[in-house]
């Protein structure tokens, strides 16, 4: 029996179950959605094509092309599309383009979890290697687990991309910005991953941190572009704007494919 048959049989059994039947209050089928790739007219550029071919990717999705266009044109943007829709490409590709064009260009990646930073470091280094930019498109993690020796080394000679978290920006970068002068002078792109996690008291705190960050950048003559990624939420542009204090463009219409899905809602008669 194929997978669809297994799922249909499972749902029928669930609805017919003497114990669960009355608890199933809704069943809906979401049809599959094919991928929507960016048009052939999109100016990908030689570097992007090289990276995509090297990673076995045939084409960018429409939302990826839209996000990259905003970044290339110096516009702040938040991308709110489902998990595994390729948001990493949206900021890594323009960052690599900028480093190739100007090796002094710098980027700051902010992640709420250390595990995310580790994963993204590997992804960035792989793209840089495919692009032949491993020598210039360097990256390093700067967080609470970074040894004192390595921190001093990073401060003395910052890599092209620093991957850290908001707390480290607040406690270790901004108060000692004179030690990071070279980095801030050349900072062009600030990536805020999982921006939807910054809400409530934490969100209020981060709004102040981002404003301090922009003031420090302006002090050193830099005007970086914010690139935020978010899970699918109702108001990504409003949230990103409130956090950063700047006008943020929104990319929400995902071009990534989606398989057929069954949505089943239960209303349990008793608690756990």
How should these model regions be labeled?
Residues 69-73, 88-103, 211-214:
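Walker A/P-loop NTP-binding motif
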Residues 96-119, 135-136, 218-222:
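Conserved SF1/SF2 helicase motif Ia
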Residues 1-65, 75-76, 137:
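Helicase-associated low-complexity/disordered flanking segments
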Residues 225, 229, 233, 237-272:
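Conserved interdomain linker/interface between the two RecA-like ATPase lobes of SF2 helicase motors
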Residues 144-188:
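Conserved helix/coil segment N-terminal to the catalytic DExD/H
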Residues 64, 80-85, 194-202, 210-239:
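Conserved helicase ATPase motor motifs in RecA-like P-loop NTPase domains
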Residues 116-143, 242-248:
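Conserved helix-turn-beta segment of the N-terminal RecA-like "Helicase ATP-binding" lobe
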Residues 88-89, 105-126, 231-236:
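Conserved Walker A/P-loop ATP-binding site and its immediately adjacent core
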